[in-house]
Amino acid sequence: MIARGVIKTRLYESPCGTMTLGSFGDKLCLCKWHTDKHGELACRRLKRILNACLEEDTSGVIEKAAAQLNEFFAGRRRVFDVPLLLIGTDFQKTVWGELMNVPFGKTLSYGEMARRIGRPKAVRAVANANGANPVCIFVPCHRIIGSDHSLTGYAGGIDAKRRLLELEGVWPIKI
């Protein structure tokens, strides 16, 4: 099959590590950490579903995303307004939609997320959907922590998750 579309990608250097930003059309479809062991899977899924190839380039939405990330890391942005293209299963999109309702400076457990989407026994599935998030930070999966307040897995690594939560003023957790 010949790819008919192009996913434009460029590197972004954050204070927490290198990321790849990607856009398809006028929407951001990728914001992944280079340390993400599932990152290649996300790229393959995007290429297959969008019938597109990856191309190192930039776009208006990528530059807007980079500018908003700069503001976020400088402590001047709490909410993002970059248009997103979320590619995943219906369940994943439900979880990601609920993640976007978790405000800056707040955390939830995976169990709380499962309850919020009406699937209280689907804690593991929620964790898996969280881990499959193709647009980290914009869909704030870093705000989900263990029920014991531990920092559990994160595509950018536990250190990046800790630094993001410190930036948002919620780490260490005050019990």
Predicted features along the sequence, with ranges:
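Basic nucleic-acid-binding alpha-helical/helix-turn surface characteristic of O6-alkylguanine DNA
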Residues: 1-121, 167, 171-175
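Major-groove recognition helix of helix-turn-helix-like DNA-binding domains
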Residues: 99, 123-132
